Amino acid sequence: MDVASGRPVITLMGENGYVYLQQPVEVSNGSTLTMAIVNTDSGLGIKVINDVNCDRNRNASCVRVGNLTYNGGPLNVVIGNRYVNFRNVNSGEVTDFATIWPGEYPYTVSRTSNPMYPVWGSTTLLQSAIYLQRDKNYTIYLFQYNPSADAIKALIVED
């Protein structure tokens, strides 16, 4: 959807008319944004994510990670056999894109006390696979499915 630049107010309303959230967001002319509904200290909030293009080689893919957990703390994501590492992605942080060749890769989400080597001494929270097509961008959004900091699930968005 195209929105004029400025500070439009985003409203999240239930079918019964109850307003769960009203929050202004900053929109710059010509920008592409993703808006995620997230938990905050005061209830619901909107996280504005700038969707910048990935500078990739022809026929490559790009991937990034968004840690949208409320109290999940820093998380590590390793794709493939350490082909791409995202270390200590803090709650509320969205990483820059990394370039990777298309294909199917396993990925692991973990928490570790060793930030330099996230696979050593780590606690695995999630393991799954991601299929990357050429000339596409992917974001792995991490959420909690219950209040436990270790209850992590992923939503992968292709763009």
Residue ranges and their predicted role:
Residues 1-159:
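Intrinsically disordered, low-complexity polar regions and short flexible loop motifs
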